[in-house]
Amino acid sequence: MNFTTQSTTGPQSQRYSRRPGLRNSAVPLHQRLLSKKSHKQQDSPLFSLIPPEVRAKIFTYALSDYEDTRRPLLYDSKVSFWRPSHRAPRRTSTELLRTCRAIYRETWFLPFPLKEQIHWICCDSDVPPGSGQFNGNAKKLALVLGEITQQGQEKVEIESFHVFANTRRLEHGDLSALLSIPGLHPRRITLTIRYIDWWGWDWESPDMPLYFKADWISAVSREISPSTSEFRIELETLEHLKDRVDAIGSHIAEHWFFGRFGGTILYADVSGKCHQVSRWSGSSAWYKKRRTSYPKAKGRKLDYYILTITFESELSIKRKGGVVSETAKRNAADPLFKHVSANLGDPSILERYGPPSHEMPGVPMLPLPDEDDDL
């Protein structure tokens, strides 16, 4: 899947500034602003007293994106995409860039790398309004990165790249296609599998075992930028089904890795010390609406459980007191290794949700952890 775009209607018209003195120029606005000398602002404590490294932290804080929780923009708490830190659209306040040329010189490039790039690889009904479609957003990102390259800028590293994915779309290669966009260099990638995004999880039979195929990992590993030092996988389910996610998490930490053979490899902590567990409660209205024969949820709230497994360098894991699985290291040392899927039940569930079972590799069933076991 190629997200690069090319005009089919001839050359595009240039964008010109409406500001006096900046009109009728094909030179990008930031280049024109930076080409002129700026006042040193020595009368301002921001420049005369505060060290540059401290000033950079202040600017980073001011230009980081945030939830715009003004009343008209808040998402309905009863929809599937409402969740902590995603209650409203995110925005960046850029007023700081318009204060003076000296500040602009130090900050003009910050809004893009500081903004968390969020992409939704799932059903359109489970995506916040205004988020756009997957292909369209990917093309926009490709255009922005292409413009940065054309301007001769050095590699721009994005702080955070967050993907919400349905496991079926994930297994079809949409994430690897997204990461293949030229010029994309995220420092941290977060992949969130919501409780509604599991392939083989049926609203009529929510206790059906979960299944997480692994064929997508090799393609993603080929596309990960050398700038990526963390790859987080967030596995979400309902609180009373958390044992299933814990079992899948144990399998992932012991067997999976990200990275190219001969290059930097990102592992997970098999001891569980570096894993994170979070919980939140949300409306049961959306859940009840899609449940017919299964017993209805009691009350107005449902409790959700999220297990976060972070893949990072072996050195980073050891510094945190964690342990890298010897199995994962052996797997990473084998250039022909194929990742083993995580299966909590009969693979025949795929006959309903995906390719025929004869197309799937043999997948071992995973035992559920005992109640006394710590992940």
Outline where the language-model segments fall.
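Eukaryotic C-terminal
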Residues: 2-11, 15-26, 160, 165-375
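Short, surface-exposed structural microsegments at secondary-structure boundaries
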Residues: 1-160, 296, 304-375
